Amino acid sequence: MIKRRDRKELRRKRHLRVRSKIKGTPERPRLAVYRSERHIYAQIIDDIAGRTIVSASTVDKELREKLTKTWNQEAAKEVGKLIAKRAAEKGIKKIVFDRGGFKFHGRIKSLADAAREAGLEF
């Protein structure tokens, strides 16, 4: 059985490996996703300028009022819709998806699918 500490270390290694290949540009910024046990966070980042353009998470006041649970796939879908809406307001349509070393299933996949349905292309 893999210990929690080892799992986190393996995820960090996967994330570093992916980050060495993926860069966000002003034309195609990076959608970075982080998943904790209770919440899910998403940011659209321009790596060249080194700044976050838009962000959304289950901690946002806008979503906290709507959600009963913040750690399920429904919450991840809401975050995906919200990040896509905020990106559209800033004129962002195409992005590069950075899963942050997490497996592409469950909450990460739900967030990505909801963002695609709401208009982001990746």
Curated annotation (Swiss-Prot):
GO cellular component terms attached to this protein's record: cytosolic large ribosomal subunit
Record GO terms (molecular function): 5S rRNA binding; structural constituent of ribosome
GO biological process terms, semicolon-separated: translation
Keyword line: Ribonucleoprotein, Ribosomal protein, RNA-binding, rRNA-binding
Family, similarity comment: Belongs to the universal ribosomal protein uL18 family.
Subunit-level organization: Part of the 50S ribosomal subunit; part of the 5S rRNA/L5/L18/L25 subcomplex. Contacts the 5S and 23S rRNAs.
Function according to Swiss-Prot or TrEMBL: This is one of the proteins that bind and probably mediate the attachment of the 5S RNA into the large ribosomal subunit, where it forms part of the central protuberance.
Name of the protein: Large ribosomal subunit protein uL18
Species, as recorded: Kosmotoga olearia (strain ATCC BAA-1733 / DSM 21960 / TBF 19.5.1)
Gene field: rplR
